[in-house]
Amino acid sequence: MIIMTYYTFVKPFFIKAVTHLHVSSGTSVEEEVDLPFQRDELNYPTIFASSLKGAIKSFLLKEYSNAREIIYKVLGSDENPDEASLGSFLDAVLFAIPARSIGVSGLDEAWVYVTTYELLRKVKSLLESMNTLSATQFTSLLDAINNILQESKNLIISDNAASVILNEDFYVELSNIQNEYIQSLLGDMLIENSTYNQSNQNSQSQGNHLVKPLIVLKDSIGREVINRSLIRVRRIKIKRSSKTVEEGGLWSEEYVPVNSLFFSSFLARGSKDTAYFADCILRKTRYLILGGKETIGKGIVELRWLND
């Protein structure tokens, strides 16, 4: 039986914040900050596909000026905005975010990674849709997430701590997952390697533990912990002549911290141009500027690709 697939190229990847990252949802009068980070329907930080695609497209046009025609074909032309592009990106789902930790029962870490069951379910949904719409199967990550989702407690992976205080105010009792495969898989995804080779389950990294523990929280407390991890910065605009604040020159911005991890994917229909773009341009891109703020040392991210 021949199975027809809609997408020929599916390239999932993690976005790791190298610096604090601000991808703005625009000016708000209802939020605690003037320029909040983009949020999904459950109020978790997210990076919408339009912002991600625009940033990657702008970066690639500068870095690969000799391949502008191919980039326009795959990501869309500025001169013909009504013409459908061959490729697209998914909204980037928050996968894990650093949270400050105070060890209560043996956990000796200044910070740990935190995620929630709801965020993992969203990543699972993306993986299942990619598996359905393409010939490529990303079963290793999907199986690892499914193993976690079978639980219903606050979990810690890669540490035996029984409890922890997160972001100064949240005392959490923990259950440990003793699963070397999940530990090594997530360890590679989160910290250690740029890519994870799904076909090599017996790789040298198989016995490694996470460089930082991963705590999976119930949704009832997880969103509050994550919200407390966000960084809110007040900024001012100074009159150079008088060294005073300009009228209306005081505002606040919201950032996700260094080492935050988002999950997304590039999807494209098959063509010679798409093949060249995916393998010779996009997959070779490791660092880019996302959300602006590069003039104040913000917005640098690293792309960590999953191997097919």
UniProtKB/Swiss-Prot annotation:
<dbReference type="Pfam" id="PF03787">
    <property type="entry name" value="RAMPs"/>
</dbReference>
<dbReference type="GO" id="GO:0005737">
    <property type="term" value="C:cytoplasm"/>
</dbReference>
<dbReference type="InterPro" id="IPR005537">
    <property type="entry name" value="RAMP_III_fam"/>
</dbReference>
<dbReference type="GO" id="GO:0051607">
    <property type="term" value="P:defense response to virus"/>
</dbReference>
<comment type="subunit">
    <text>Part of the CMR ribonucleoprotein complex, consisting of crRNA plus Cmr1/Cmr2/Cmr3/Cmr4/Cmr5/Cmr6 at 1:1 and possibly 3 Cmr7 dimers. A Cmr2/Cmr3/Cmr7 subcomplex without crRNA can also be isolated. It does not cleave target RNA.</text>
</comment>
<keyword id="KW-0051">Antiviral defense</keyword>
<protein>
    <recommendedName>
        <fullName>CRISPR system CMR subunit Cmr4</fullName>
    </recommendedName>
</protein>
<dbReference type="InterPro" id="IPR013410">
    <property type="entry name" value="CRISPR-assoc_RAMP_Cmr4"/>
</dbReference>
<comment type="similarity">
    <text>Belongs to the CRISPR system Cmr4 family.</text>
</comment>
<keyword id="KW-0963">Cytoplasm</keyword>
<comment type="function">
    <text>CRISPR (clustered regularly interspaced short palindromic repeat) is an adaptive immune system that provides protection against mobile genetic elements (viruses, transposable elements and conjugative plasmids). CRISPR clusters contain spacers, sequences complementary to antecedent mobile elements, and target invading nucleic acids. CRISPR clusters are transcribed and processed into CRISPR RNA (crRNA). The CMR complex degrades RNA complementary to the crRNA (target RNA) within UA dinucleotides, generating 3'-OH and 5'-phosphate ends.</text>
</comment>
